Amino acid sequence: MRRFLTLLLFLALAALSASAQMVQDASYRVVGHIKSDGTIQDASYRVIGHIASNGTIQDASYRTVGHLERNGTVEDASYRIVGHIKPDGVILDSSYRILGHVKTDGTVQDASYRVIGHVKGIPMEWAALYFFFR
């Protein structure tokens, strides 16, 4: 289940982009697709979730699994704060420990600066969700 949520929320990063987007892992393998209507698909185009324009992330059954607030606060489905996204791309957990980084070019890095994915043309805040729901 945790792996499912990780993939779902990583894919949700791109959901509100103008057109469908591909999400890639560190080796540039496609791990999913996002349609312009907010439908999230895995690499085989199977629907695994949805994203609403208000930042609510849902699984394929429309159960809410998380929220991204406008101020950068990240919450789980029960609205418990699980972390923070700083404007410079630094991702912090609820205890303010660094979890990772999102670069302006779409590169996603872990806390040790190892590349773990690529999300071109996607807002940094959405890319940062990966760290909270994996």
Indicate where each model-derived feature is located:
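Long terminal segments
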Residues: 2-8, 12-47, 53-55, 61-64, ...
